[in-house]
Design a protein with these regions (language model features):
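Conserved donor-binding/catalytic core segment of Leloir-type glycosyltransferases
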Residues: 4, 188-207, 213-226
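N-terminal strand-loop element at the rim of the active site
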Residues: 8-14, 28-66, 154-155, 160, ...
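An aromatic- and histidine-rich active-site surface loop
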Residues: 72-83, 87-117, 277
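Membrane-proximal helix-turn-helix segments that form the acceptor-binding/catalytic region
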Residues: 80, 130-148
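Nucleotide-activated donor-binding/catalytic signature segment of Leloir-type glycosyltransferases, i.e.
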Residues: 227, 235-257
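Short hydrophobic beta-strand element within catalytic cores of glycosyltransferases
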Residues: 268, 287-294
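Aromatic "clamp/platform" in nucleotide-sugar-dependent glycosyltransferases that forms part
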Residues: 273-274
Length: 368
């Protein structure tokens, strides 16, 4: 059976959540006998070597177009190519390609499984026009796809209430255990184990990066910020805090052992995401045994449950950081056990893949 995955920057993951999803789901489906192809953009060479036996197909993107137009062109080209390749099921990461769904046949649209992600239009970086387009693409995805997938129950409730259409809950998975307690990453950034905070996120306003920087600075504690800073917001923050000795901008790190080294040696893990959905970076922090302080919203509480502390404002954030900093070993161990139990019960990649296999088989009327 031929499965296509579109809507990401490709595999292996060097960007974010959808790319981590595409990498993990494609490799695992391939090992179960599915013929999986990940479609991803290219600007130079259209031949892409397979990754872990997963085929990769390069979709031409014209480098001289503005980035927004590159994305539009990439989405349309991906769908057009898929129409020729004729896969059995198309897993679409995000709903931005749905602007073009109405122009394709119903037979083609009946293959579309759209992972709606969080509520993209709520992200603070978007202006009025972008929010309108995102709301429109969300509505078109709901109307023209075969199945909507929600990665959290909160998003599932929103989709079913908003669009009166059945949706399926399938979360993301967590990466377990790879990486030594210290593989040299702490030395690279001149860090003392258990004497720094950690944040792993895309450097965007809705992830409350600056709120964390200010809180750790006021408490005179080091904070390591992991995430690509080559964004408008990233450029602002790196310039604004260039002389602040308490913040280290480590850039994007995609080597799992290095990330886990930073996670396992941090005193506090900060998760400020507010835009919704089950966030892979939070799951990975839980799997690594981090002691977590998270923004208090329904998405984070659904994922983390009683495995961390929460904050709604700056005062609560600083109080939570202080509390975690003063945890003894037993308190830290208790939090880690709660996270480990929750992840293994709901958020392993084997659970996620099983749910996608069931969905794929139900759509194609084949037995598991």
């Amino acid at each position: 059976m031929k499965i296509a995955i579109i809507g990401t920057k490709g595999i292996p993951n060097t960007y974010g959540g959808f790319e981590a999803f595409a990498e993990n789901i494609s490799v695992r489906l391939q090992t179960q006998g599915y013929n999986v192809t990940v479609y991803q953009p290219y600007t130079e060479n259209n031949y892409l070597e397979p990754f872990e036996s997963v085929s990769r197909f390069g979709v031409k993107v014209f480098r001289y177009l503005p980035k927004n137009l590159q994305r539009v062109h990439y989405n349309l080209s991906s769908l057009s190519i898929l129409q020729q390749h004729n896969p059995d099921v198309i897993i679409c990461c995000g709903h931005s390609p749905s602007i073009f769904f109405p122009f394709f046949s119903k037979a083609f649209r009946d293959k579309l499984v759209v992972n709606m992600d969080g509520l993209e239009w709520k992200r603070e970086k978007w202006g009025v026009v972008a929010r309108f387009v995102l709301k429109l693409s969300e509505r078109l995805a709901a109307r023209y796809s075969r199945v909507m997938v929600a990665d959290s129950m909160a998003v599932l409730r929103y989709l079913m209430s908003k669009y009166r259409k059945e949706a399926v809950f399938i979360p993301y998975g967590a990466q377990f255990g790879e990486g030594a307690e210290n593989d040299g990453c702490t030395e690279k950034y001149n860090l003392t184990p258990m004497e720094y905070g950690l944040l792993v996120a895309r450097i965007e306003p809705e992830n409350r990066i600056e709120q964390a920087i200010k809180a750790f600075a006021l408490l005179n504690k080091k904070l390591v910020v992991v995430g690509g800073v080559n964004t408008p917001y990233g450029n602002v923050l790196t310039k604004r805090y260039a002389t602040n000795r308490n913040v280290i901008f480590a850039g994007g790190i995609y080597h799992l052992a290095s990330l886990n080294s930073l996670r396992k040696n941090c005193r506090v893990y900060y998760h400020g995401h507010t835009a919704g959905g089950t966030n892979p970076s939070l799951l990975d922090a839980m799997a690594a045994g981090c002691t977590i302080v998270a923004s208090d919203n329904e998405y984070n509480r659904e994922t983390l449950a009683d495995g961390g502390l929460y904050f709604k404002n700056n005062d609560e954030l600083m109080a939570a950081i202080k509390a975690i900093w003063n945890f003894d070993n037993n308190e830290r161990k208790t939090m880690a056990q709660r996270c480990d139990r929750r992840v293994k019960q709901q958020y392993t990649w084997s659970i996620v893949v099983d749910k996608y296999v069931n969905l794929i088989n139900s759509l194609t009327n084949e037995k598991a």
